[in-house]
Design a protein with these regions (language model features):
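Gly/Ser/Thr/Pro-rich low-complexity, intrinsically disordered segments
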Residues: 23-50, 55-61, 74-462
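N-terminal signal peptide c-region/cleavage motif recognized by signal peptidases
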Residues: 17-19
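Bacterial N-terminal signal peptides that target proteins for export
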Residues: 1-10
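Repetitive helical segments and hydrophobic/amphipathic motifs
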Residues: 13-14
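Sec-exported N-terminal periplasmic low-complexity segments
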Residues: 65-70
Length: 462
């Protein structure tokens, strides 16, 4: 009888021990990966993993009080992490031991479906700095990890009540061309400035730009841009220019460009924003208009430009058409930017493509015919976003460096959604991406120095 009791007791003890082991969540696998920004260690389990962390010197220990495990070691060779070991600590316990080569920031967090415990060890020093620049204007710098890559971002948030207004300006000074964004921002006393529209090497603006209701650059390709209808109403919308000149003989000419170099069979509209003169050669015909009446005609090229006048400069077939005009002729000009909102906007700057619409990622690179070097790949970026409450976001991210990989357009859109953007548009990026605060460049341009640009966007006093 005593023998039977002893056997039953032993069986009961064995069952209790098995139940205790079964209650411990088994860790199925230890795995690791290395990216530019971090080393990631993952513990896979069929059950949620409880943990308690402790760091002493260069050793991070993660106690797993209810997780059983077999001894495992990650196959890692990294400048930041020396070794990663999963160590059994009795039947119901185990420990994750991470030995570091240098002091690093880290983050530990559980995930579900499937159950995992993730340990991220960062190669770089994560940092956030925030500064109040003016009433309603905040600047935030971040060194962070985004999608497993390092990222440096520079964000200016402008609340609707701020006594500042966003306006375009020429980085070249008074006229069209290329120049130092930082120099112009300092000379104009701007609190904040960023680069904006695309341009060619001669400073030809590729896009539509309007300031104080006056159009100073145009592009026929429909592309997204920022529109300011008044001090309080701002939107992001498609913009596409079309314009005509109606000749007295009934011929209607299509205006193909504004304030840019004249090319073959072209018809370009110039105003005094461009330069003191049209800078054209003698192989064409130019007509100066005031109040839509012809006041001067020239075949010599390089016609002067004065405020209140417009010059039509034609080459080839368009030069031949302009030959029918005489002094005093009435030549009505029409132009539209494709919508009533764009036509009545006081301020307008196009870039492209659209990034965010109704709070969702909506990258329209193909629809807006963006060049492959813009549409593809990871690069420094400049963007503008609008939040539901009217807050304006000016964002620059660095790229092409060890501390910041840059973003794809899709990632840029995701980042802006994360910031709360309801709508957003991309501007010129790469080596052009630049943010200036109080006359000082705060980001790190990827060329290693400031690139001269054409159009900037700055915060002007209302």
């Amino acid at each position: 009888m005593n023998c039977k009791k002893l056997i039953l007791s032993l069986l009961a003890a064995a069952l209790v021990a098995q139940a205790a082991v079964a209650a411990a969540a088994p860790i199925d696998k230890l795995r690791s990966s290395v990216s530019a920004a971090r080393v990631r260690v993952v513990l896979d389990s069929k059950e949620p993993i409880k943990y308690k962390e402790a760091k002493q010197g260069l050793v991070l220990e993660v106690a797993l009080p209810e997780s059983s495990a077999k001894a495992q070691q990650a196959a890692l060779k990294d400048a930041a992490v020396k070794s990663v070991r999963l160590v059994p600590d009795g039947r119901r316990k185990s420990r994750l031991v991470v030995e570091l080569n240098r002091d690093c920031q880290y983050k530990i967090y559980p995930l579900k479906e499937p159950n995992r415990l993730v340990v991220d060890i960062y190669r770089l020093q994560l940092e956030t700095r925030t500064q109040q620049l003016a009433g309603g204007v905040t600047y935030t710098y971040k060194q962070e990890e985004f999608g497993g890559r390092p990222l440096q971002s520079y964000l200016v948030s402008v609340a609707p009540q701020a006594r500042l207004r966003l306006r375009p300006f020429s980085a070249a000074g008074m006229y069209n061309g290329r120049g130092s964004l930082a120099k112009q921002a300092a000379q104009r006393g701007l609190l904040v400035a960023v680069n904006a529209s695309y341009f060619d090497r001669d400073g030809w603006v590729i896009g539509n730009v309007k300031d104080n209701g006056e159009l100073i650059a145009m592009d026929e390709t429909p592309r997204s841009g920022y529109l300011q209808l008044n001090d309080r109403q701002q939107i992001i919308k498609d913009i596409a220019y079309s314009g005509t000149a109606q000749l007295p003989n009934g011929q209607r000419l299509e205006i193909k460009g504004m304030n840019r170099a004249r090319i073959a069979n072209d018809l370009v509209r110039f105003n005094s924003y461009y330069a003191p003169s049209t800078k054209t050669n003698q192989y064409g015909r130019e007509v100066k208009l005031k109040n839509n009446h012809v006041i001067a005609i020239s075949t010599a090229g390089n016609m002067t430009l004065e405020p209140g006048t417009v010059v039509l400069s034609g080459h080839g077939v368009n030069a031949a058409a302009l030959a029918s005009l005489r002094l005093g002729d009435y030549v009505p000009l029409t132009q539209t930017l494709g919508s009533n909102a764009a036509d009545r906007a006081q301020v307008l700057v196009s870039g492209g493509p659209l990034l965010v619409e109704q709070g969702r990622v909506q990258v329209r690179a193909a629809e807006e015919q963006m060049a492959p070097d813009i549409a593809r790949g990871r690069a420094p970026r400049t963007a503008l976003g609008l939040k539901k409450d009217g807050t304006l976001l000016l964002l620059v991210v660095d790229g092409r460096s060890a501390t910041s990989s840059g973003l794809t357009l899709e990632e840029l859109a995701q980042y802006l959604v994360k910031l709360g953007a309801e709508s957003a548009v991309n501007f010129d990026g790469g080596g052009s991406s630049e943010m200036v605060i109080n006359g000082r460049i705060v980001n790190k341009p990827s060329d290693g120095r400031e690139r001269y640009v054409s159009i900037g966007l700055g915060l002007f006093t209302k």
